[in-house]
Regions:
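Anionic, Ser/Thr-rich low-complexity intrinsically disordered regions
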Residues: 84, 88, 107-111, 137
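Active-site recognition of the HExxH zinc-binding catalytic motif
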Residues: 112-125
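Post-HExxH zinc-binding segment in Zn-dependent metallohydrolases
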Residues: 132-168
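Acidic/His/Gly-enriched intrinsically disordered linker/tail segments
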Residues: 156-192
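Pan-zinc metallopeptidase signature
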Residues: 177-230
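N-terminal low-structure segments adjacent to metalloprotease catalytic domains
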Residues: 1-25, 212-230
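Short pre-active-site segment immediately N-terminal to the catalytic Zn-binding motif
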Residues: 97-113, 133
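Auxiliary, metal-adjacent structural segments of Zn-dependent hydrolase domains
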Residues: 21-92, 151-155
Length: 230
């Protein structure tokens, strides 16, 4: 369901792209927590996130305090990998706008996803990086926090089953947590995002070819630079 985009050590300065994306998003502050949406009609998404936060606060106050203490933002936007993720540069929980808007997505699910991503933020603040070798353990911890939260709810058998199923997959034999497989899924997700936005297939193919060409040039220049130093 969810995956982190956390990379490297903590930083406090936002990139220009992050600043622009925040600037164009419609947002408000709820109980000290920034919530925003990149959608043109943002109000339904913001209301659902607020309702999910109220659910966490009402049913599991400890989890709510951890969410508030761990995250700076909850941002509803297009997410390339999974239905949500933790974005380190913004200290934000990102929720995919397509999932949030779906009639099949319950408030309990949204609340559970927020608890999951807040756990990613909490672990990173403790110096636990989302490296490949420990990725399945981190996901296991986050899923367990979700499961603990879900136990405070009623009538959520389907959510219990989903979390338990994901928890069973959090092991070192699951190849989906390798860097290679995760980047492949992100590429697939980026293509689906472009299709969702109405981008023609030939443009999508061109974007990926240009990306691969630029990456190849960067690798070549690094090799040349290394040879020059030697």
């Amino acid at each position: 369901m969810v995956a982190t985009m956390s990379r490297g050590s903590p930083v406090t300065k936002l990139s220009l792209a992050d600043r622009f994306a925040l600037w164009v998003s419609k947002s408000r502050v709820t109980d000290g927590l920034w919530i925003g949406s990149a959608q043109s009609d943002s109000e339904p998404a913001l209301q659902r996130v607020e309702a999910a936060l109220q659910l966490i606060n009402r049913c599991a106050p400890l989890h709510y305090r951890r969410v508030k203490n761990s995250l700076s933002r909850i941002w509803v936007t297009l997410v390339p990998h999974g239905a949500g993720c933790y974005l380190h540069s913004l200290n934000a929980c990102l929720l995919d706008e397509r999932v949030v808007a779906s009639e099949n997505t319950t408030l309990e699910w949204i609340a559970s996803a927020i608890v999951h991503e807040a756990t990613h933020a909490r672990l990173e603040k403790r110096g636990i990086r989302y490296d490949e070798a420990v990725r399945h353990r981190i996901e296991r911890i986050c899923a367990r926090r979700e499961l603990d939260f879900a136990r405070h709810l009623s009538g959520v058998d389907a959510l219990h089953e989903e979390i338990t199923r994901r928890l069973d997959l959090c092991n070192d034999e699951n190849a989906s947590y390798t860097d290679q497989n995760m980047w492949q899924k992100i590429d697939q997700g980026n293509a689906e995002m472009l299709r969702h936005l109405g981008t023609p297939e030939w443009v999508i193919a061109l974007v990926f070819r240009a990306r691969d060409l630029l990456n190849g040039i960067r690798r070549f220049t690094r090799r040349i630079a290394g040879a020059s130093v030697q």
